[in-house]
């Protein structure tokens, strides 16, 4: 009691307010009643006081709604294009400009009550301060931004028909289920000239995508951007909007002289197909490299020759596949006869023999073949043309590899030798035929396939 009394004596008595009775005294700031009082609830989100942010639009004073839950996009500086003559205003400058502009900038909106967003009263294209009023209407204030999540910046393309093309935007998506109506999208955010007349109706089906009109605010024009960047967005747009963007892209490319890049097969950057025609047979190729690989068919050149058997090939890759024949590894075996092969493709061709399947039939004699290569070689026998001739004995052949094997008879090069009798052959086929006819009847003395291969390698 003494301590409390001393405290009261140290503090001067409170002065009575005007109009109050002298008996009523003011509660001390450090009184026990104030300290023990119940803590008040947290403060509500910021709401503008009536009259604090009023703008005279000519039709009476109307309040700007700063707490609208609408998503928005914050325009930044253009990326990778020519810098605009008039830079974007800072946040504080935009706010001050909105207060000074009043009704001239479309600040007057209707229906500030509740969570709805007022619609700009400006008719036609919004004026310079439209970006300001859009920010005010969409609730672009520090207290409203934490309610949404900021998505990675994306580049809006000049080819989609936007005057503010090439600008970098931050997409602010609110998790609230409240989205603007189609009237708001069509009447304010998409004025004439921003997109074509079909855009507002198409974009109404995708309420999360909003484009702020900052062309006049930044001083940007569509003719300043000559190189369009691809339209990027995390979410797939609805089909009507994609159709609208495609149409606008085609129109902008026509007007701006931007050449489209064709991604069709056989197409080039200028849209013209790449046709490389063979002058001999008229076959068409989509690349010059393929035409170069085709020409040895007519010239007969086989620069890639096997060092073991002397067989020539047009391509190095074919020679590499051929070299497997001379190795001992044959992992692919036939389940019916037990014959082993180096490649699985050769095994598949061999299985046709057991099945009796001969898909390649000669049109002249009706003979069938398991492989397409044998079918082509057989057709040359009906033509009677033997363009490959030996320079020593003038013997002619249908195929160039037959001439290559024939040349071994003149230089005594016979890489395939029989392990039983020691006879040499130019081709492995002739060696196998020799063993089958002469040595298979002997039985134990008949060499195996592995022995023949080892003889060739030695």
UniProtKB/Swiss-Prot annotation:
GO BP terms, alphabetized: cell differentiation; nervous system development; regulation of DNA-templated transcription
Subcellular location: Nucleus
Species of the source: Bos taurus
Sample GO molecular function, one term: zinc ion binding
Chain coiled-coil ranges: none
One Pfam family cited in the UniProt record for this chain: zf-C2H2_6
Magnesium found in the keyword field: no
Family: Belongs to the krueppel C2H2-type zinc-finger protein family.
Gene name of the encoded protein: FEZF2
Protein name stated in the entry: Fez family zinc finger protein 2
């Amino acid at each position: 009691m003494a301590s409390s009394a001393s405290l009261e004596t140290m503090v001067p008595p409170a002065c009575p307010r005007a109009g109050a009775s002298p008996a009523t005294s003011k509660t001390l700031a450090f009184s026990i009643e104030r300290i023990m009082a119940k803590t008040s609830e947290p403060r509500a989100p910021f709401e503008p006081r009536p009259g604090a942010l009023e703008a005279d639009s000519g039709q009476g004073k109307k309040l700007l709604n700063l707490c609208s839950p609408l998503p928005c996009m914050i325009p930044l500086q253009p990326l990778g294009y020519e810098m605009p003559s008039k830079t974007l205003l800072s946040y504080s400058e935009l706010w001050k400009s909105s207060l000074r502009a009043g009704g001239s900038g479309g600040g007057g909106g209707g229906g500030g009550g509740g969570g709805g967003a007022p619609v700009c009263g400006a008719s036609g294209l919004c004026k310079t301060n439209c970006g300001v009023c859009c920010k005010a209407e969409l609730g672009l204030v520090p207290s409203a931004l934490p309610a949404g999540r900021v998505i990675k910046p994306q580049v809006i393309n000049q080819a989609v028909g936007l005057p503010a093309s090439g600008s970098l935007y931050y997409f602010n998506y609110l998790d609230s289920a409240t989205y603007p109506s189609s009237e708001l999208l069509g009447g304010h955010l998409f004025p004439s000239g921003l997109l074509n007349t079909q855009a507002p109706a198409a974009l109404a089906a995708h309420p999360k995508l909003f484009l702020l009109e900052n062309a006049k605010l930044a001083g940007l024009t569509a003719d300043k951007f000559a190189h369009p960047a691809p339209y990027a967005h995390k979410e797939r747009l609805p089909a009507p909007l994609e159709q609208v963007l495609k149409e606008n892209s085609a129109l902008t490319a026509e007007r701006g002289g931007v050449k489209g890049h064709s991604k069709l097969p056989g197409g080039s950057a200028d849209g013209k197909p790449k046709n490389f025609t063979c002058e001999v047979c008229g076959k068409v190729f989509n690349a010059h490299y393929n035409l170069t690989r085709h020409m040895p068919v007519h010239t007969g050149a086989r620069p890639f020759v096997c060092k073991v058997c002397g067989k020539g090939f047009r391509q190095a890759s074919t020679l590499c596949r051929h070299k497997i024949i001379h190795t001992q590894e044959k992992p692919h075996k036939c389940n019916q006869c037990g014959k082993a092969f180096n490649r699985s493709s050769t095994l598949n061709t061999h299985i046709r023999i057991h099945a009796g399947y001969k898909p390649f039939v000669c049109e002249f004699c009706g003979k069938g073949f398991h492989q397409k290569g044998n079918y082509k070689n057989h057709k040359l026998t009906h033509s009677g043309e033997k363009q490959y001739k030996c320079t020593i004995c003038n013997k002619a052949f249908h195929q160039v590899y037959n001439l290559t094997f024939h040349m071994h008879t003149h230089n005594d090069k016979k890489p395939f030798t029989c392990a039983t009798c020691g006879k040499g052959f130019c081709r492995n086929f002739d060696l196998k035929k020799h063993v089958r006819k002469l040595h298979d009847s002997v039985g134990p003395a008949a060499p195996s396939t592995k022995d023949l291969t080892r003889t060739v390698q030695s």
